């Protein structure tokens, strides 16, 4: 039961950090490539 309570307290923290960093990454991509439907660094 103690491990389950530890899991319940760790999972929200990790998900908050993950989604926060993902949102920051998307914001920075949109800052350098605004309104890009196809990203220039993916085209060959």
From Swiss-Prot:
Its main location: plastid. GO terms for cellular component: chloroplast thylakoid membrane; photosystem I. It is a single-pass membrane protein. GO terms for biological process: photosynthesis. It is found in: Plastid, Chloroplast thylakoid membrane. It comes from the Eukaryota. The chain crosses the membrane at residues 7-27. The keyword Oxidoreductase does not apply. InterPro entries: PSI_PsaJ (IPR002615), PSI_PsaJ_sf (IPR036062). PANTHER family: PHOTOSYSTEM I REACTION CENTER SUBUNIT IX, PTHR36082. Belongs to the PsaJ family. May help in the organization of the PsaE and PsaF subunits. This is Photosystem I reaction center subunit IX. The gene is psaJ.
């Amino acid at each position: 039961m103690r491990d389950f309570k530890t899991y319940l307290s760790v999972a929200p923290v990790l998900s908050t950090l993950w989604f926060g960093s993902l949102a920051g990454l998307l914001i920075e991509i949109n800052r350098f490539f605004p309104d890009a439907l196809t990203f220039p660094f993916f085209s060959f």
